[in-house]
Amino acid sequence: MNPGIDLEQRFVETLMELGLTPGVAKTIWLPIPMLLMIIGATVGVLVSVWLERKISAAAQQRIGPEYIGPLGILAPVADGIKLVFKEDIVPANTDPWLFTLGPILVVIPVFFSYLIVPFGQNILITDLGIGIFFWIALSSIAPIGLLMAGYSSNNKYSLLGGLRAAAQSISYEIPLALAVLAVVMMSNSLSTIDIVNQQSGYGILGWNVIRQPIGFMLFWIAALAECERLPFDLPEAEEELVAGYQTEYAGMKFALFYLGSYVNLVLSSILVAVLYFGGWDLPIPATMIADWINVDPNNAIFELVTAGLGLVMTLLKAYFFLFLAILLRWTVPRVRIDQLLDFGWKFLLPVGLVNLLLTAGLKLAFPFAFGG
C-alpha cells in the first residue's frame, strides 16, 4: 500500500524550517483541516446551487441567474438570506415537536458524515478506523426525520411524501452498503484514508472503478436515490405531491431540508471520487512526474505541491459527478413508485450480492490485484 503524502508532517517541517518550534507548528496545523471541511461544505452547497441553476437554464435555452453578482454567483447567498428572514409558520393541528425535529434529524447526520471525508491526504477532521460504517450508520437516520416531517404536518401530501422517502431510502440503502462492502473487502479497511491509499501509486490504473465497474454503477445509482435526485425524486414530486414532506414547511425549517439535500449531493459526489476514482490520487503517479522533471519524490516542496494538486483533483472529480447529477435532472423521466421499489429490490439488491461474491472470488484468485 502506498503510504501517500503526510501533509501534516510536511507542513510542520516547513514551519520548523522557518524557525517555529514543533509544538507551535502542530498547534497551527490543528484547526486547518476543520476549517477546510466547514468552508468546503459551505462553498460546495453554494456552488452546487449556482451550477444547478446555470446548467438547468442552459438545458432550457435560458440565461439563468445573471444580475446578483458576476454571472449570478451570489444568487444562492441571496436565497439563504431570504429564507433566514422568512416567517417560520407552524400550521394548526400539527405536532410541533415532531414538526421541528424532522428537518433537524435530516440535516445533522449529513454534516456529521463530513467527519470522515478526506479532501486530500490528511485533510480531514478525523481518520476513523470505522469511517465507512460510521457514514452508513448516519445515513440511516435520515428516513426517521423524513417520516417525522411527513407525519407531523397533518397533510395528506406530506404524509405520502414522507412514506415514499422512507421506503426509497430503506430500499436503496442496502445496495449502497453492498457496493461499499466490495470496496472495503479489497482495501481490507473501513477507513477512507486507507481506501484511497490502496488505490494510489499506479495512477488511473489503480483506481477502484477499473476493478469495480459494477460496484461503481451500483453505488452511483443508489446514491442518486438516497439524494432524491431525478429520476428518483418521488418523495417531493411537484406534479403529484406539491412538495412532498416539505409542503407545510417555511422559513428556516424549509431551508434545512434545502440545505441537507445539496450537502448530501456534494457528499455523495465526493464519496464517489474517494471510493472509486482514487480521491486525491493523480491520474499519473507522482513518482513518474518526479522522474520526468528530475526531482526527488521525497522533496518536501514537491510533496506539498503534489498534495495541493491532490486537493484540486478531489474537487474536480466530485464536481464532475455533481454536474452529471444535475444533467440527469433534465435528461431522464421520473419513475413510478412501483418501478422504483422493483428496481431497488429485484435488480440492484441481487446485483449487489453477486458483485460482492464476485469480488470475494477474485480476491482469492488474484490477491495481488484485489487486495488479498
UniProtKB/Swiss-Prot annotation:
It comes from the Bacteria. Pfam families: NADHdh. It catalyses: a plastoquinone + NADH + (n+1) H(+)(in) = a plastoquinol + NAD(+) + n H(+)(out); a plastoquinone + NADPH + (n+1) H(+)(in) = a plastoquinol + NADP(+) + n H(+)(out). Its main location: membrane. The keyword rRNA-binding does not apply. GO terms for molecular function: NADH dehydrogenase activity; oxidoreductase activity, acting on NAD(P)H, quinone or similar compound as acceptor; quinone binding. It is a multi-pass membrane protein. The chain crosses the membrane at residues 27-47, 65-85, 97-117, 128-148, 176-196, 204-224, 249-269, 308-328, 351-371. InterPro entries: NADH_UbQ_OxRdtase_su1/FPO (IPR001694), NADH_UbQ_OxRdtase_su1_CS (IPR018086). GO terms for biological process: aerobic respiration; photosynthesis, light reaction. PANTHER family: NADH DEHYDROGENASE SUBUNIT 1, NADH-UBIQUINONE OXIDOREDUCTASE CHAIN 1. NDH-1 is composed of at least 11 different subunits. Belongs to the complex I subunit 1 family. This is NAD(P)H-quinone oxidoreductase subunit 1. It comes from Acaryochloris marina (strain MBIC 11017).
